[in-house]
Regions:
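Intracellular alpha-helical coupling/juxtamembrane segments of multi-pass membrane proteins
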Residues: 258-291, 295-301, 305-312
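Alpha-helical segments in transporter systems
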Residues: 138, 287-290, 297, 318-324
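ABC ATP-binding cassette signature C-motif
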Residues: 1-271, 315, 322-561
Length: 561
């Protein structure tokens, strides 16, 4: 039987109930083939991460059975990896090739033993030592162990890991995830379980990871909100919907097409969700020139959106973003802007102008200056040189993602309601509980304490807080991290119909292709490019501008030869 037809594990009647008596997995029967590439999608709280933990053997409090064929190994990347804080980056990454490191250590011990007088004086011990040395040499040759340092360096470079001598204790959450992912990929397990693998990765690292997983011989099961990733890697989509696991053959675009047709058959009246799916499918089917035209049309439609009936817009959209005050001609302008910290120059001679109704996607590696740009806009930082001006009519809506001012003891409902059942939004009364439900906080979830929220729940709350501010310029810092695809789709539509500007830091190229009218690209070495067009338009522009000269790290190289 060919490997791609061999079932390596099955889930037999798997169910899971969490307090207070909420069933998130309901009687799931699934079989998984060796080599299959599976993307898991569903609302936050639908059981995606729980499913991975059950497969990984970390969650045993479920009903039913998970049956593995003998001899297969499982590797798991969790959302918040637990790493030894006392180890360095290199020491943790080396754990991914522990069998090879153990062989090298023993080989060194054997070589050192040749100097032992007891061995030198005993021909029998010398023969035994030479035989073991030859055995180890064969194993090391077979695994190309002599090039292990190059392999580790290649892997760490591909995923932009921090310097190899840095202690884990001083790393950010994003840096820890990259180190953990690097270690896992080097282990090369037969079954690779990935929980939001693209979070905290820049576009180049995501591209490398996609190519690596496309060629990965084993089974890959990934929970992700990144729809381009699902399109490029997945051969199957597993949708978790109200506890049921529904498999769909094909990538994300194929799922979108099949799902829309199925919903059309099941529903006589068009729901908001179905209409949202249909509009995304319409966008997917657009030719590139039609997408460009749509982006340009947004820039000239500010007055139309501003004067549109907000009640009708709210009824049409799953996430409705109310218009803020009318913007003047000057929104945000930078001329010859420069900013550095000590010897590190973030940008030099930065120039851009954000027009009314523009949506700027901000891209670039971590530490390049994206957060500093937000701080400049907020007036929390000053430039070293140049002119930076925020227009007088600008009202900024932004919530610090660190949530420093939020008490962990407060509930989601208390944070949004501020002690009142309804508040004014878009010129109308909005019920606080109804507003939260738009961000998939329903029922008991609204009473969850801030201190126990997951990453995805925190980001949804962050969005709800920011959009409630009724600003005319939205600053969204990584709004797509850990958020389910349904909420992302609704957010995209909300932004498309918003009469105002947005500055969105994101590594999600699908989101930027749908919403961005401009790209502000932090390209490294203090170079920043402001480009009118979507993310894909910018990528094409960059290829034409740079020709075949690409940074060495962009080119895909395998971890193993």
């Amino acid at each position: 039987m060919a490997d791609d037809k061999k079932i390596i594990f099955s889930m037999v009647g798997v169910s899971k109930v969490i307090p207070p008596q909420r069933q998130i997995l309901k009687n799931i029967y699934l079989s998984f083939f060796y080599g299959a590439k599976i993307g898991i999608i569903g609302l936050n709280g639908s059981g995606k991460s729980t499913l991975l933990k059950i497969i990984a053997g970390l969650d045993k409090s479920y009903q039913g059975n998970v049956v593995f064929s003998p001899g297969y190994t499982v590797g798991y990347l969790e959302q918040e990896p637990k790493l030894d804080p006392e180890k360095t980056v290199k020491e943790v990454v080396q754990e991914g090739v522990k069998p090879i490191m153990d062989l090298l250590a023993e080989y060194e011990e054997v070589n050192n033993a040749f100097c032992d007088p007891e061995v030198l004086e005993n021909p029998e011990k010398m023969d035994q030592l030479m035989a073991r040395q030859a055995e180890l040499q064969d194993k090391l040759d077979a695994t190309d162990a002599w090039n292990i340092d190059n392999k580790l360096e290649r892997a760490m470079d591909a995923l932009r890991c921090p310097p190899d001598d840095k202690k884990i204790a001083v790393l950010s959450g994003g840096e820890r995830r990259r180190v953990a992912l690097c270690r896992l990929l080097l282990q090369q397990p037969d079954i690779l379980l990935l929980d939001e693998p693209t979070n905290h990765l820049d576009a180049e690292s995501i591209d490398w990871l996609e190519q690596h997983l496309q060629q990965y011989p084993g089974t890959v099961i990934a929970v992700t909100h990144d729809r381009y990733f699902l399109d490029h890697v997945a051969g199957w989509i597993l949708e978790l919907d109200r506890g049921e696991g529904i498999p769909w053959k094909g990538n994300y675009t194929s799922w979108l097409d099949q799902k829309t047709k199925r919903m059309a058959q099941e529903e006589k009246q068009a729901s908001k969700r179905r209409k949202t799916l249909e509009r995304e499918l319409e966008w997917v089917r657009m030719a590139p020139k039609a997408r460009q035209a749509k982006g340009k049309a947004r820039l000239s439609s500010y007055d139309r959106l501003l004067n549109e009936d907000q009640k009708a817009r709210e009824e049409k959209l799953e996430i409705y973003i109310p218009n803020g005050p009318r913007l003047g001609n000057k929104v945000i302008e930078a001329k010859g802007l420069a900013k550095a910290y000590d010897d590190k120059v973030l940008f030099d001679d930065l120039n851009f102008m954000l027009p009314p109704n523009g949506i700027v996607g901000v891209i670039g590696p971590n530490g390049a200056g994206k957060t500093t740009l937000f701080r400049l806009i907020m007036g929390q930082e000053k430039q070293d040189r140049g002119e930076f001006e925020v227009g007088e009519t600008v009202k900024i809506a932004y919530v610090d993602q660190t949530h420093k001012d939020l008490s962990p003891e407060k509930s989601v409902y208390e944070v949004i309601s501020q002690g009142v059942e309804s508040f004014r939004m878009g010129g109308r009364d909005m019920n606080a509980r109804a507003y939260l439900s738009k961000f998939n906080f329903t029922g008991a979830d609204q009473e969850k304490k801030i201190g126990v929220l997951s990453g995805g729940e925190r980001n949804r709350l962050h969005l709800a807080m920011a959009l409630k501010e009724e600003g005319n310029v939205l600053l969204l810092d990584e709004p797509t991290n850990d958020i389910d695809v349904n909420t992302l789709r609704a957010l995209e539509e909300g932004l498309e119909n918003f009469a105002g500007c947005a500055v969105v830091v994101s590594h999600d190229s699908w989101v930027l292709d749908r919403i961005a009218t401009h790209i502000l690209a932090f390209e490294g070495d203090s170079k920043v490019t402001f480009y009118e067009g979507s993310y894909s338009d910018y990528e094409e522009f960059k290829k034409k501008r740079d020709g075949n000269v690409e940074p060495k790290r962009v080119r895909y190289r395998k971890l193993t030869d």
